[in-house]
């Protein structure tokens, strides 16, 4: 049985970023995901303007950006529209396939171990360890 300082369940943007920072600090990290990367995501690729805070991880956002949103219409009470226009983007659309995969690659490059094709089922916490229980996706029919 392999031992890790940290096990991160889910290698999406949050999990991969957590694994990246933990591995960068010298922790032994297992990054587990039920999918195999690169993988498609059914959900949208919208990110808020705060992605710029991650420039130290991703140096070239143009590799992932589909579009920058600088205008939006919001409907308030009684369905009255409010047209919001900004000189700077306030929302970005990205390609999740490439973006998520690149974050996983960065985590692995820092030393995280990527374990693909299994899902965390449960975990048991004891005084000196946490036991992570999982099953292989080949034994089950997984879908996003």
Question: Where is each model-derived feature located?
Answer:
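Glycine-rich FAD pyrophosphate-binding loop
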Residues: 7, 23-43
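Flexible, glycine/proline-enriched loop segments at strand-loop-helix junctions
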Residues: 11, 37, 89-91
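Small-residue (primarily alanine) positions within well-ordered alpha-helices
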Residues: 11-14, 18-19, 23, 107
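N-terminal FAD cofactor-binding segment of flavoenzymes
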Residues: 38-73
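Conserved N-terminal helical subregion
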Residues: 61, 74-144
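Short, glycine/charged-enriched secondary-structure capping and boundary segments
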Residues: 22, 44-47, 129-130
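Beta1/beta-strand and adjacent pyrophosphate-binding region of the FAD-binding site
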Residues: 1-14, 30
């Amino acid at each position: 049985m392999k031992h890790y300082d940290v096990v991160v369940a889910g290698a999406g943007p949050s999990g991969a970023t957590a694994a990246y920072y933990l591995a960068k600090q010298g922790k032994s990290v297992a990054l587990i995901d039920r999918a195999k990367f690169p993988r498609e995501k059914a959900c949208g690729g919208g990110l808020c303007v705060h992605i710029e805070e991650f420039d130290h991880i991703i140096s070239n956002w143009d590799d992932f950006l589909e579009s920058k949103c600088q205008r939006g219409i919001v409907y308030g009470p009684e369905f009255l529209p409010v047209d919001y226009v900004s000189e700077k983007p306030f929302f970005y659309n990205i390609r999740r396939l490439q973006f998520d995969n690149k974050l996983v690659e960065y985590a692995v490059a820092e030393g995280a171990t990527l374990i693909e094709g299994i899902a965390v089922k449960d975990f048991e916490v004891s005084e000196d360890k946490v036991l992570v229980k999982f099953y292989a996706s080949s034994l089950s029919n997984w879908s996003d």
